[in-house]
Each structure stands twice: as C-alpha cells, then as structure tokens.
C-alpha cells in the first residue's frame, strides 16, 4: 500500500509560503523605494 508522503506536503507548503513572503516583501519594497528615491 502506498500512502502519500507527508514530507512532500511539507515541501509544497514551504514553497508556497516562501512565494507569499517574497511577494509581500516586493509589495512593501515598492512604496519604500519610491519614498527613498524621491
């Protein structure tokens, strides 16, 4: 019997949270860069 590996689910969750973190940093960096460069 083959069961789904919980490690694969953990890797997928970490990858998704990493992408959300990068997106959040990018969204926050745009107004800060506009504020600093003006």
From Swiss-Prot:
Extract one GO BP annotation from the record: photosynthesis
GO cellular component terms attached to this protein's record: chloroplast thylakoid membrane; photosystem II reaction center
* Keyword flag Membrane: yes
Specify one Pfam family. PsbL
Its membrane topology: Single-pass membrane protein
Provide the protein's localization.
Answer: Plastid, Chloroplast thylakoid membrane
> What are the alphabetically sorted keywords of the record?
Chloroplast, Membrane, Photosynthesis, Photosystem II, Plastid, Reaction center, Thylakoid, Transmembrane, Transmembrane helix
Entry's transmembrane regions:
17-37
| UniProt-listed InterPro entries | PSII_PsbL (IPR003372), PSII_PsbL_sf (IPR037266)
The text of the family note is: Belongs to the PsbL family.
| HAMAP family documented for this protein | PSII_PsbL
Known partners and oligomeric status = PSII is composed of 1 copy each of membrane proteins PsbA, PsbB, PsbC, PsbD, PsbE, PsbF, PsbH, PsbI, PsbJ, PsbK, PsbL, PsbM, PsbT, PsbX, PsbY, PsbZ, Psb30/Ycf12, at least 3 peripheral proteins of the oxygen-evolving complex and a large number of cofactors. It forms dimeric complexes.
State what this protein does.
One of the components of the core complex of photosystem II (PSII). PSII is a light-driven water:plastoquinone oxidoreductase that uses light energy to abstract electrons from H(2)O, generating O(2) and a proton gradient subsequently used for ATP formation. It consists of a core antenna complex that captures photons, and an electron transfer chain that converts photonic excitation into a charge separation. This subunit is found at the monomer-monomer interface and is required for correct PSII assembly and/or dimerization.
Q: What is this protein called?
A: Photosystem II reaction center protein L
Q: Record the organism.
A: Pinus thunbergii
